[in-house]
Amino acid sequence: MKSKLLLLSGCLVLALNSCRSDIENPQTDSIDPATTKLDNAKIHKLSIDGKFTYVNEINGEYFYAEDITISPEQFNVLQKQANPGTSTAEKSTIVSSFIKTWPDATVYYTLPSQGSLSTQNYNTFLTNINKAFDMISSQTSMQFVERTNQTEYITFTYTTSNSSPLGWQKNRVNGIKIYNITYPAIIAHEIMHSMGIMHEQCRPDRDQYIIVDVNKAVEGSRHNFNLYNDYAGHGAFDFGSVMMYQSTDFAIDSSQPVMTKLDGSTFTKQRTGLSAGDYAGINHLYGPVNATSAVNGTYTMRTALASDKNVDVSGSSTTDGTSIILYSASTGNNQRFTFTKSDHGYYTIKSILDPTKVLTVKSNGTTNGTAVELRTNANTDSQKWLLFNLGNNGFGFAPKNAPALRLEVKNGTTTNLTPIVIGTTDQTVQPSTKQRFILTKVN
């Protein structure tokens, strides 16, 4: 899967773009841009940042893909993103509401009841659920813990299809439906959806690796090829991912595949285990700062603007009010920080120079250009930062006291001593380069 830190370029893709069908182009999309009905499904077609997103509504349940359900609240987030009347500031505050990861990289669960399964099949189901847990946790920081009294957890039910809710949501129980009880990797696939992981073919950079022609897909299946723009993909596109579909999936005619490689060749899927890319993706999505083990980790914060410039405590001073600046990369403690969880999704960013001092929005400011400084931790909202995991594009940071603003390098300048400030988001999905930072663990 290689979930989602570096922008890739593809000249070959640019040459091919003019001759392929593209769901983002209204001229080549045969589905009318409105809500349509198909048998028992209502198909919602939403235009988000110039690209179409499909959601199938069936009996009041929203399907973001054939096997991914989203809550009414998540559907509302998509509608707000698609609404041209929604301001950029409002969009920037809701973008993190669509998919959330599990706190402390811990997923609580309950095992299924036997239901209509024979004793033999029921035992097989239980065994393979545990194999799926082991498969995921064996090379990641994820923990699966049997529920006691937790409010948010996952459950399993044997049904006639496979599906899972997408990501963690407060006060929600994620009911995972499983038909293929004899395949641990398929169960793992659905668990990974509950962890907040999308299908590989939905990466926004997919067009650098594959050609997708949704006009060859059966009616009502286009939601399986939605582009998820909030996450840039981690590492290279992974054809061996357990989250990847094959060329002919959902095709009207198997001789006319929906997806091919750039050279026109086809590919198959595998459901035997997680790939190296899947493990790397999980470890990025749930790290470096989402995992409990990372609380004591130390990181540098490099700007995406340049490979040799880091966030820096000016003059290595620990005096309250010391400026946070951009400076040439070094190994000094003035460029090393630890992340400590405060609220779900929010972190304090401590200086290694003095762990009682944290990155703070000056004077609790909420206006564009307000400086960021070092100050004694008082547990205020101006000292808590919401992290946006952007995969290959690094991380974005929003202060809790001003959620519509983002940590940025002032004016996008890479000169030494440039102030680090909070600024208005100028893009609704992926932040601009000056608002993206690469976290590198140094010990």
What is the role of each PLM region?
Residues 1-4:
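Positively charged n-region of N-terminal signal peptides that target proteins for export
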Residues 6-11:
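Sec-dependent N-terminal signal peptides
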Residues 20-293, 300:
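Zinc-dependent metalloendopeptidases
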Residues 151, 237-238, 274-279, 330-334, ...:
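Extracellular interaction modules
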Residues 290-318, 333-366, 381-414, 431-443:
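Extracellular glycan-recognition/adhesion modules and their associated mucin-like linkers
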Residues 319-333, 369-378, 423-428:
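Surface-exposed turn/loop modules enriched in turn-prone residues
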